[in-house]
Amino acid sequence: MKVLNNLLYTGDHEWVRVEDNKAYIGISDCAQRMLSDIVFVELPEVDDEIAKGETFATIESVKAASDSYMPVSGTIVEINEELEDNPAALNEDPYGSWIVAIEMADKNELEELIKPEVYEKICEELDKEA
């Protein structure tokens, strides 16, 4: 299982990559492994305003459907349209296949996210339980 050191994470297994006031958001390797084969991703619309903690995407796999929750508040400025035709990209490259990009409303919310070294321990514990 892979955890990248240049990202921040949530307890719901989303990752955040910050570029100035823009944040790219996707699901972690840990999440895609739990979901298994991803077959569909329901994406939001560009210009949607989504508050921290609200659902921004639904990911369906052969095992289950899972909501993804916005780690920081903001406005959707980009969606990864590749996922409409190739949702399995989230399995193949979870850190290269972001879901949305947002213009953050409050960068201070980033302080509440999980650092990579802590998230790695969380995933290791989940692996032991599996």
From Swiss-Prot:
<dbReference type="InterPro" id="IPR017453">
    <property type="entry name" value="GCV_H_sub"/>
</dbReference>
<dbReference type="GO" id="GO:0005737">
    <property type="term" value="C:cytoplasm"/>
</dbReference>
<comment type="similarity">
    <text>Belongs to the GcvH family.</text>
</comment>
<dbReference type="InterPro" id="IPR033753">
    <property type="entry name" value="GCV_H/Fam206"/>
</dbReference>
<protein>
    <recommendedName>
        <fullName>Glycine cleavage system H protein</fullName>
    </recommendedName>
</protein>
<dbReference type="Pfam" id="PF01597">
    <property type="entry name" value="GCV_H"/>
</dbReference>
<dbReference type="InterPro" id="IPR003016">
    <property type="entry name" value="2-oxoA_DH_lipoyl-BS"/>
</dbReference>
<feature type="modified residue" description="N6-lipoyllysine">
    <location>
        <position position="63"/>
    </location>
</feature>
<feature type="domain" description="Lipoyl-binding">
    <location>
        <begin position="22"/>
        <end position="103"/>
    </location>
</feature>
<dbReference type="GO" id="GO:0005960">
    <property type="term" value="C:glycine cleavage complex"/>
</dbReference>
<keyword id="KW-0450">Lipoyl</keyword>
<dbReference type="InterPro" id="IPR002930">
    <property type="entry name" value="GCV_H"/>
</dbReference>
<dbReference type="InterPro" id="IPR011053">
    <property type="entry name" value="Single_hybrid_motif"/>
</dbReference>
<dbReference type="InterPro" id="IPR000089">
    <property type="entry name" value="Biotin_lipoyl"/>
</dbReference>
<comment type="subunit">
    <text>The glycine cleavage system is composed of four proteins: P, T, L and H.</text>
</comment>
<comment type="function">
    <text>The glycine cleavage system catalyzes the degradation of glycine. The H protein shuttles the methylamine group of glycine from the P protein to the T protein.</text>
</comment>
<dbReference type="GO" id="GO:0019464">
    <property type="term" value="P:glycine decarboxylation via glycine cleavage system"/>
</dbReference>
